[in-house]
Amino acid sequence: MNGPRTLDVVQRWFQAVVTHPDGVEGGVDSEEAQRLIRLKRNELEAVVRRSRNLTAAERLSIYANAYYTRLLECLGTYYPVLKSTLGEEVFEGFAFEYLQRYPSQSYTLDRLGESFARFLEETRPGREEGVEPDRVDWPDFLIDLANLEWNVARVFDGPGVEFQPLLTPEALRSFPAERFAEARLAPVPCLRLLSFQFPVNSYYTAARRAGEGEEVPLPGPAPERVALTRRDFVVRRYALTVAQHALLEKVLAGATVGEALAAAAGASDLDDDALAAELRAWFRLWAAEGFFQAIT
């Protein structure tokens, strides 16, 4: 396309050049850039003027380097524990490849890391010959950790209830017992449930508390279930048992309290009396921690 160079054409050409993974030279030669403005590398000054000290290519390289530097920094803020676990160089290698497959689609960058866990799943190494196909290993740990960190970020940035009334333990306790089984709990919008193959929530806590240069032992595979919510603009993480997870999963799906209790009973090996005592303690805790907005 070598017609009049409108501002729109030049802007799209500039984007194609400075965002190319092979740098400015690769960007100039790319199909998209050539479609917009056909020129050779030594003809760059027909579009971008040189300065007193820098050539056109050098000026473009400043933008190209800054573009990826900013995106890598942004991904690092979403995945700080994953970055420290892998090391900066390895993390940025993964992140750079990710940006080629899932380029930024928003000027705000607030969803830049949305598909990072999916990318790790898509690019995970094949399992070694002779290893059971359902065995979990190191890549699965990284995928779990990425999923946890992204959900923490989304809960932090997402809707919350900081200035809204919540269901208090007192209000829950005073709800008519005869209506309890058929009632429905309204969870707060920031409540999320997660299930992992590795204890990444425990690892995340240890890694965030570790001092600079302190190594945190990597855990072996062990199922872990977690609830995330936000209170007073701080993301809270709660380890869950299988029965707790089953109960809250039903609540989030809009089931009645009775249906949620049945799910918890089916997932628990406690006898009826012991489970009833546990359920009372769970509901007191969850109401105190702001899991629910109302019961109707």
Where on the chain are the PLM-derived regions?
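Short aromatic-glycine motifs in intrinsically disordered, low-complexity regions
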Residues: 178-180
